[in-house]
Amino acid sequence: MSENIHSHRILILDFGSQYTQLIARRVREIGVYCEIYPFDMSEADIREFNPKGVILAGGPESVTELGSPRAPECLFNMDLPLLGICYGMQTMAEQMGGKVAGSNVREFGYAQVKIERSEDGLFENIKDHVAEDGKPLLDVWMSHGDKVVALPEGFVISASTPSAPIAAMQHESKPWFGVQFHPEVTHTLQGRRMLERFLVNICGCKQLWTPGRIIEDAITQVRNQVGQDKVLLGLSGGVDSSVVAALLHRAIGDQLTCVFVDNGLLRLHEGDQVMDMFAKNMGIKVVRANAQDQFLSKLAGENDPERKRKIIGHTFIEVFDAEAAKIKDVKWLAQGTIYPDVIESAAAKTGKAHVIKSHHNVGGLPEDMEMQLVEPLRELFKDEVRKIGLELGLPYDMVYRHPFPGPGLGVRILGEVKKEYADILREADAIFIEELHRAELYHKVSQAFAVFLPVKSVGVVGDARRYEYVIALRAVETIDFMTARWAHLPYELLEKISNRIINEISGVSRVVYDVSSKPPATIEWE
């Protein structure tokens, strides 16, 4: 019997930092399972979770302010390895008798720390440069206003900068560590090695969390959960539902039926590609509901983006329900819920990130649906879902395809949605994406798409003036989709794409490129 992949686990306590999920992703990339819980987790819950070690993440507040978050006191009596990052280090120092003060120099961005103690800690055999006095130097990323100004009893300084003499600390006899910088961001060049030292050498975790083992574990869980029952999955062609389809098919074969709703708002040939991939190549039972007319007639005359989204959502449920009703004795509904959905859903209910196991319904499902949920990806981050997709044999270009909104082209056609507009947009978008692939830039940008503007602009063909529609192109670069900058594509490429769209698609006289960053603009136009 292979070892339980959840048995060597790390607990991450969240103090509200934007980097908390990134810490969890880094821990898992190293091959160790972890979960995120709020900072005020009870002692009973911590003991039940039974971690090999605890990471106290960062947070936006100041330890010096009354009522700011604190780590559970029980942690300091449990003999568990602890790693405090940024705010996590500060609250650890303060709670154990050290002192934290506001700094008159905010450290934000790149910094160099000098290693004062490297043996038996996070920094053993790790360096980027060597200082004049022979001590190792590390390139790191800082983001803090406060700093630790007096060590708690039993701690020593392990790294320093000129403006933060206590940039890292460690206990002389216990496996407790604090760093003022962020090892989880790529700007801290040796960050992964530091985390690996903490997880593997200090906490003693085995690196069991790998795509192959995750798939084995998920298959076992699904088989135990659904037995011989039938399972229904709404297949969109997006990454999450595609990976769920491949995973469930491997686990339960013909007990799975997928319903693919073609709403007329998909990308060029997307419906046929989904059917070829899943029904033809993989032998999965897929029912295709051709509901283009239904969607377009309900959207007729509607200009408001929010109402368009709602109409598309409600119509999807109507069509899906009608197809589901034709399939007898289905007990389970599969969903592509992933871990960030679970965290966000819990945070919306409680004001903070919460537990994986609490029941999470992504919303939009009818109240009277008498099916139970099976969500095989609910423990996984998006990058893990992609790796599992590749491991299951899905093509790279499908797994690493850019995000596509749920309402599809419905929110990339400004104002009213018409079949004519959708057809023009599909062709324009396909040319844009094809040329990005040809220039080997598709996977270098995070998202790229065309937008249909329902305004007519004057153009000249031969000697004749003509008034035709405008296409906007949007391409962005981002790490987390919370902020994004417009992609600086080569002018020659933009010229080529523009010429092709105007010459090959009747009805378009002008192409523009969107140079807005997020914020203030959003990535999608609607």
Curated annotation (Swiss-Prot):
Gene Ontology molecular function: any one: GMP synthase activity
Key words of the record: ATP-binding, Glutamine amidotransferase, GMP biosynthesis, Ligase, Nucleotide-binding, Purine biosynthesis
Protein's UniProt keywords contain Nucleotide-binding: yes
Pathway: Purine metabolism; GMP biosynthesis; GMP from XMP (L-Gln route): step 1/1
Xref: InterPro entries: Class_I_gatase-like, GATASE, GMP_synth_C, GMP_synth_GATase, GMP_synthase, GMPS_ATP_PPase_dom, NAD/GMP_synthase, Rossmann-like_a/b/a_fold
UniProt key word Membrane: no
Amino-acid positions noted as binding ATP in the UniProt annotation, renumbered to this chain: S236, G237, G238, V239, D240, S241, S242
Residue ranges annotated for the Glutamine amidotransferase type-1 domain, each copy included: 9-208
Top-rank taxon: Bacteria
Enzyme class, UniProt record, top EC level: ligase
EC number: 6.3.5.2
Residue span(s) of domain GMPS ATP-PPase: 209-401
Catalytic reaction annotation: XMP + L-glutamine + ATP + H2O = GMP + L-glutamate + AMP + diphosphate + 2 H(+)
Residues at the active site: C86, H182, E184
One GO term describing the cellular component: cytosol
Record's subunit section: Homodimer.
Biological function: Catalyzes the synthesis of GMP from XMP.
PANTHER family: GMP SYNTHASE [GLUTAMINE-HYDROLYZING] (PTHR11922:SF2), GMP SYNTHASE-RELATED (PTHR11922)
Protein name (database record): GMP synthase [glutamine-hydrolyzing]
Gene symbol of the encoding locus: guaA
